[in-house]
Swiss-Prot record:
Organism: Saccharomyces cerevisiae (Baker's yeast)
GO biological process, one term: maltose transmembrane transport
Gene Ontology CC: plasma membrane
Subcellular location: Membrane
Main location: membrane
Segments for region (Disordered): 1-48, 594-614
Name this polypeptide is given: Maltose permease MAL61
Any GO MF annotation of the entry: maltose transmembrane transporter activity
Entry-linked InterPro entries: MFS_dom, MFS_sugar_transport-like, MFS_Sugar_Transporters, MFS_trans_sf, Sugar/inositol_transpt, Sugar_transporter_CS
The encoding gene: MAL61
Keyword vocabulary terms for this entry: Maltose metabolism, Membrane, Sugar transport, Transmembrane, Transmembrane helix, Transport
Amino acid sequence: MKGLSSLINRKKDRNDSHLDEIENGVNATEFNSIEMEEQGKKSDFDLSHLEYGPGSLIPNDNNEEVPDLLDEAMQDAKEADESERGMPLMTALKTYPKAAAWSLLVSTTLIQEGYDTAILGAFYALPVFQKKYGSLNSNTGDYEISVSWQIGLCLCYMAGEIVGLQVTGPSVDYMGNRYTLIMALFFLAAFIFILYFCKSLGMIAVGQALCGMPWGCFQCLTVSYASEICPLALRYYLTTYSNLCWTFGQLFAAGIMKNSQNKYANSELGYKLPFALQWIWPLPLAVGIFLAPESPWWLVKKGRIDQARRSLERILSGKGPEKELLVSMELDKIKTTIEKEQKMSDEGTYWDCVKDGINRRRTRIACLCWIGQCSCGASLIGYSTYFYEKAGVSTDTAFTFSIIQYCLGIAATFVSWWASKYCGRFDLYAFGLAFQAIMFFIIGGLGCSDTHGAKMGSGALLMVVAFFYNLGIAPVVFCLVSEMPSSRLRTKTIILARNAYNVIQVVVTVLIMYQLNSEKWNWGAKSGFFWGGFCLATLAWAVVDLPETAGRTFIEINELFRLGVPARKFKSTKVDPFAAAKAAAAEINVKDPKEDLETSVVDEGRSTPSVVNK
């Protein structure tokens, strides 16, 4: 907090010393934006992340004072940046409790998606559901849902999610985050009626497709809303909370399905009740989101400055003159950043995400990060109850295993929060993949034996897989996909990455259905060999292409990508992006990023606008 206090004190001094000039002078915000905009057009430096400037700077008529004013702005930015980066978790929670609470509320919408997708997979192991909608397997004498219908139902909700993701963008532009989420919750509550009163698998398919659209909305806005209202110190915790919500939803589904198996095994309530319980969520969440503050970034983009100020007053804690200064500085930061983005270019298109080498690299990493959640075999966990039955355990025991599995997933996410203080993003991602690969190979080996002990062992090891998945790749991905894109293309990159995940998930789901269904490949636990191999392939990509972003601010990540730093050198490379900004503003000679990487040095008293390896 020392840097923040220093920044506030200098803000007070500057306001006092320039009182007369404020009355008669020129507002330099526009001047500085124009100066930096012109230089930005000549260089690759991303000015959109100069977010911590104090706002209006008041130069006199002598333009020679502009560099001094810019130096002061850069110093303010650097101190605020360092203050947030070094802020401990508990300090951040005490300083920004309301921002954290609102972010947690919005992210809770993901519980519904985790819940519904989990119960769909569990229904395939529920006898009453199998008998009503399945067909008799002449080989086993049991009823089963055909592979084609299992694939079709999965495709329906994934198609709905893809449509929902694409609709979310223009909807947010028109009505904002809050009302888009409330509208999605309203439609979800309406679409649940189709599932509850279903008479055929066709009705379930329609209901899943329609419910998928609001789920797609939740996937995008939970991450973007958290990143816009919360400070850097809480970034990892609040973005990975999305994974925790997913796991909570899956845990609720497992508990409810076990209850259905025990009490309603031969009644339609066995599958209708789990559908009906989805109505619990939309109303209280809609009320909470209605009471939540709108993103101040969206309000400023729409020119609603007074509303943005009131939103910041609700987000930031504290009271008195200090809070007023914090609100003013934050508002100036948002206004200046948006002004620069609007002057430098348009909002950005999907083509911009892949047009140039830098953004193409960032988009590729974001997409492959999320695809890694599919290619590592984690989708097998979603069909754990079905998997356990095929491994030879009873239906009741299968649901018990699922509950234990999701409890381990929740515990693993909390362990991930603790481990993030000592390990980087890449470390957790790679660690999780390596241990998953080992566990899958062991599961595959056990699948070669037909003994009861081997079948029970394979089911138990799948719970271990769930633990390492939720310790490593599952939570880290939500943080990485918010860190990889540039500010201007963040929402569109997240949408592309999630849709890449959805497309690959379709392929993975088809493979799993064929692997587990007794009428098709009937691999059972032997499928562990297949997914263990894909875990190793995903790990190989991560070693080559996934950079380490832990402890890096967005402006530092921008500079590292601009300079083309190799993925494995992100962690050991020092950057001074504020020196780069000052150099751009002063119109010094702009060098090629590769030349910066080779020739830059950091002296005791000053640093060049690029990098030095430790």
